[in-house]
Amino acid sequence: MAEFTSYKETASSRHLRFKLQSLSRRLDELEEATKNLQKAEDELLDLQDKVIQAEGSNSSMLAEIEVLRQRVLRIEGKDEEIKRAEDLCRLMKEKLEEEENLTRELKSEIERLQKRMAELEKLEEAFSRSKNDCTQLCLSLNEERNLTKKISSELEMLRVKVKELESSEDRLDKTEQSLASELEKLKSLTLSFVSERKYLNEKEKENEKLIKELTQKLEQNKKMNRDYTRNASNLERNDLRIEDGISSTLPSKESRRKGGLDYLKQVENETRNKSENEKNRNQEDNKVKDLNQEIEKLKTQIKHFESLEEELKKMKSKNNDLQDNYLSEQNKNKLLASQLEEIKLQIKKQKELENGEVEGEDAFLSSKGRHERTKFRGHGSEASVSKHTARELSPQHKRERLRNREFALNNENYSLSNRQVSSPSFTNRRAAKASHMGVSTDSGTQETKKTEDRFVPGSSQSEGKKSREQPSVLSRYPPAAQEHSKAWKGTSKPGTESGLKGKVEKTTRTFSDTTHGSVPSDPLGRADKASDTSSETVFGKRGHVLGNGSQVTQAANSGCSKAIGALASSRRSSSEGLSKGKKAANGLEADNSCPNSKAPVLSKYPYSCRSQENILQGFSTSHKEGVNQPAAVVMEDSSPHEALRCRVIKSSGREKPDSDDDLDIASLVTAKLVNTTITPEPEPKPQPNSREKAKTRGAPRTSLFENDKDAGMENESVKSVRASTNTMELPDTNGAGVKSQRPFSPREALRSRAIIKPVIVDKDVKKIMGGSGTETTLEKQKPVSKPGPNKVTSSITIYPSDSSSPRAAPGEALRERHTSTSNIQVGLAELTSVSNHVSSPFELSIHKHDITLQLAEAERMADGPLKDRPETVVSRSSIIIKPSDPVERNSHAPPAETIRWKSHSAPSEVGFSDARHVTVRNAWKSRRDLKSLEDPPTRIGKNVESTNSNAYTQRSSTDFSELEQPRSCLFEQGTRRVGPSSGDAPEPSSRRTQSSLTVSEVLTRRNRVGDTITVAAWNHSASMEEEGEDCTLSVYRQLHNSLDPSELPGKQGLPESGRVRAEERLRPTRPCAEEN
């Protein structure tokens, strides 16, 4: 009503206003008429004067008078009109007054209605409040029901426990009885032992007496023998003398006989004495031996009894412990019984609540209070139990506990979960107790522990059991997000620098199908291990292990411990990393024969964001070096679906301003999750081979994308760049581990598919990439702004759905969706002298779709073959270009821009679109092909260097045209150009995402030179995409070409090899940077 009345008022007021306006107009007209009348009157007066003056001319005057009369009549008629108008005005005034009164009444009505509305609103609010209260009450009721269910289940569990406790009590009683009987036996044994001891002591004393008596007898016998022998000798002498004196004449024979007889008698006597003495001695010796044996027996018995006494003491202590346990169990039982009663009361009350007998809120509050009380009680009981368990712990148990704690700490390092740590310690403690105690005691302690676990304050029984039974989720699944933060936390160890890799390598965990089962437990170590185990195994040990393929495993083992250190080390000055990279590069050259050692260097280089800056500097320095190094592409492929790990390493001398684009870029393409890092190598070392090796290393880092995209992508991309730049390029010869000593073109590296090992850990990379990749890249981009030598580092993750088909015909429609996220960091080359250097570092996050140049179809060249792809490629890329140096050869503007673009489109250009969708391998091949167009494949890497397309882009799924486009226009269209490219930067309005640009546009902008290359590259890249399900390219490329697209052609050669991987929106390296 109020609205209707207000509407009526407004309508009536409008009508009145309209009438007023018309009346005012009439009034104005009447006023004009009155003025005219006054003028006529004045004229009449004048005429009258004239008539008076000119009486003579009456006739004429009369005629005039007639005319005047007519005019007066007319004027009078007008006066009537004026009167009528005045009447109308009066009426209008009256009507207006009436309308005003009406409006006042309506206002009052409106106010009344508003008051009523306010009242109704209050009622509604009250109603909604009551509704909310009702819903809350319903929820609380449901909660209470759930609680009752839980409590009933807990009751059942408690009943079971009570039964277990009762059984344990029975067992304890039995053990007590057995112990008591054993004690009695021991007591009787001890009594018998004591009596035996007394008896034995008495025997010993008697034996001693006997021994003394025997010794005395022996001494007496000895004396008697001596006396007897003396007497016999005297008698003989006397007899001889007598015989001699009586008859010296007696025949000598008789005397001899007598002497012989006497002698025989003497001998017999002596022998008799000796035998008697010997008999006595033997008897005494035997007795002594017997006594000694008895003494030894007694001693052994005493020892046995002492050991029995100790056992008795132990048994007594155990008995006391068991009694304590029994008491604690009784207390627990009482607590449980009380809890059961409370729970029963709660259940009754809840039933009453459900029946509506008790008011809902009061019941809810009271039940809540009770629930909390039970919780506290549970805590108290748990505390008491813990006391008993502590008492039970023997030193051995404590030792076990310490061991468990260490173990738990180790687990925490890897799993980051407290639960995981606690559960093993519980189980170990229990096991230790069980081993040390008798079976009965073991069961008792287990019971107490169970109860303890049950009442652990933090968790209910079930939770405790879960924690015990299940390793933490982190331990069960590969650490993804965690690894990120962890890796950064890690201490910096040069050896550990694999930690950085670890991040990158998270995805690369599956790398080599090597032992990654262990990887999941080590969030950091995983990636490191995976990367280490992959052909890049050495990288974990960076400089140390480069020489040995076997080191991969070592790196994997050390990767976990080192991963953390590696991250920290990565933060070390990039100069450190660079020097290490150089070393690694040298080592890698030796190792090139071993495909496994290829990657190692790259991953080993720890670079943090700071390192990124250093890497950028390194890039600039490498450019300065002026060593044109062929780009080496290392592809490790264990299976088409396995992560392709391709590294395209391009080294170029920095000295050439145009060839700055040739900066060594390690482009790593992992078909699945591998991030391709293309980094112009910061290492000043001229050796292209070593750089290539190092670059190949970058691959493991690419894995970072999986989990670390948000936080880690930027850092990791930087790391990978550093690692790749520092690491020597490991050239992959075609399928053969060609020695790194010989520089390889990216095409050659691409050819060496055999070397490619799966770096990817199969993770749902698409999800990761699709959802957060762009944002993460944006976040990561921030650090990229660090000033550094001109470097473009791009981390591109491309997930081709089909990695199985190594190469897809450019015309083939790719059915897979390609999503790629790339972080591209372009550090302005601090050297302004290089004309082609991009002065602004920028990080590009490019989705593979962008990379695939899903340009707006309108813009795309109408390439049918790409359109053939049924699936639309969606690409999101965010590009942050922060110019570290405003000064750039190519007038790359320092302004930093963050550009994000998404394009959904089916590539329309045949050649370009094909290239766009081409997988990493195709991209590599395309690079080769492009190079082949420009140069023989072997020359490609060199050409790339020479072309100064240091920003040697990897496009796994990007059109070369797009890449080229990006160089000249990519950023222009897809993104606003951060800085105006020296010649190329289009207006910001033209900065549509390159994805929107047609490949042809990109190519044309870049340079026509790249077009054929891009087509070939796309064809290859398409097949590559199919092969590599997901390729993550972590490309750190310094776009040294700030050159106009015309300059780009040289770069295009790089893009051919490198761009393919680069997915280079970056491609526009210089131009792109300028545009961006």
Swiss-Prot record:
<dbReference type="GO" id="GO:0070062">
    <property type="term" value="C:extracellular exosome"/>
</dbReference>
<feature type="modified residue" description="Phosphoserine">
    <location>
        <position position="440"/>
    </location>
</feature>
<dbReference type="GO" id="GO:0005737">
    <property type="term" value="C:cytoplasm"/>
</dbReference>
<dbReference type="GO" id="GO:0051233">
    <property type="term" value="C:spindle midzone"/>
</dbReference>
<dbReference type="GO" id="GO:0005923">
    <property type="term" value="C:bicellular tight junction"/>
</dbReference>
<feature type="modified residue" description="Phosphoserine">
    <location>
        <position position="574"/>
    </location>
</feature>
<feature type="modified residue" description="Phosphoserine">
    <location>
        <position position="611"/>
    </location>
</feature>
<feature type="compositionally biased region" description="Low complexity">
    <location>
        <begin position="793"/>
        <end position="806"/>
    </location>
</feature>
<feature type="region of interest" description="Disordered">
    <location>
        <begin position="929"/>
        <end position="998"/>
    </location>
</feature>
<dbReference type="GO" id="GO:0070160">
    <property type="term" value="C:tight junction"/>
</dbReference>
<feature type="compositionally biased region" description="Low complexity">
    <location>
        <begin position="569"/>
        <end position="578"/>
    </location>
</feature>
<feature type="region of interest" description="Disordered">
    <location>
        <begin position="675"/>
        <end position="746"/>
    </location>
</feature>
<protein>
    <recommendedName>
        <fullName>Leucine zipper protein 1</fullName>
    </recommendedName>
</protein>
<feature type="compositionally biased region" description="Basic and acidic residues">
    <location>
        <begin position="253"/>
        <end position="291"/>
    </location>
</feature>
<keyword id="KW-0175">Coiled coil</keyword>
<dbReference type="GO" id="GO:0090537">
    <property type="term" value="C:CERF complex"/>
</dbReference>
<dbReference type="GO" id="GO:0003281">
    <property type="term" value="P:ventricular septum development"/>
</dbReference>
<feature type="modified residue" description="Phosphoserine">
    <location>
        <position position="932"/>
    </location>
</feature>
<dbReference type="GO" id="GO:0003383">
    <property type="term" value="P:apical constriction"/>
</dbReference>
<feature type="region of interest" description="Disordered">
    <location>
        <begin position="1042"/>
        <end position="1076"/>
    </location>
</feature>
<feature type="modified residue" description="Phosphoserine">
    <location>
        <position position="255"/>
    </location>
</feature>
<feature type="modified residue" description="Phosphoserine">
    <location>
        <position position="659"/>
    </location>
</feature>
<keyword id="KW-0597">Phosphoprotein</keyword>
<feature type="region of interest" description="Disordered">
    <location>
        <begin position="862"/>
        <end position="913"/>
    </location>
</feature>
<feature type="modified residue" description="Phosphoserine">
    <location>
        <position position="1042"/>
    </location>
</feature>
<keyword id="KW-0009">Actin-binding</keyword>
<feature type="modified residue" description="Phosphoserine">
    <location>
        <position position="394"/>
    </location>
</feature>
<feature type="compositionally biased region" description="Polar residues">
    <location>
        <begin position="410"/>
        <end position="428"/>
    </location>
</feature>
<dbReference type="GO" id="GO:0061635">
    <property type="term" value="P:regulation of protein complex stability"/>
</dbReference>
<keyword id="KW-0965">Cell junction</keyword>
<dbReference type="GO" id="GO:1903119">
    <property type="term" value="P:protein localization to actin cytoskeleton"/>
</dbReference>
<feature type="compositionally biased region" description="Basic residues">
    <location>
        <begin position="368"/>
        <end position="378"/>
    </location>
</feature>
<feature type="modified residue" description="Phosphoserine">
    <location>
        <position position="745"/>
    </location>
</feature>
<feature type="modified residue" description="Phosphoserine">
    <location>
        <position position="512"/>
    </location>
</feature>
<dbReference type="GO" id="GO:0016020">
    <property type="term" value="C:membrane"/>
</dbReference>
<feature type="region of interest" description="Disordered">
    <location>
        <begin position="569"/>
        <end position="600"/>
    </location>
</feature>
<dbReference type="GO" id="GO:0051015">
    <property type="term" value="F:actin filament binding"/>
</dbReference>
<keyword id="KW-0966">Cell projection</keyword>
<feature type="modified residue" description="Phosphothreonine">
    <location>
        <position position="679"/>
    </location>
</feature>
<dbReference type="GO" id="GO:0021503">
    <property type="term" value="P:neural fold bending"/>
</dbReference>
<feature type="modified residue" description="Phosphoserine">
    <location>
        <position position="690"/>
    </location>
</feature>
<dbReference type="GO" id="GO:0001725">
    <property type="term" value="C:stress fiber"/>
</dbReference>
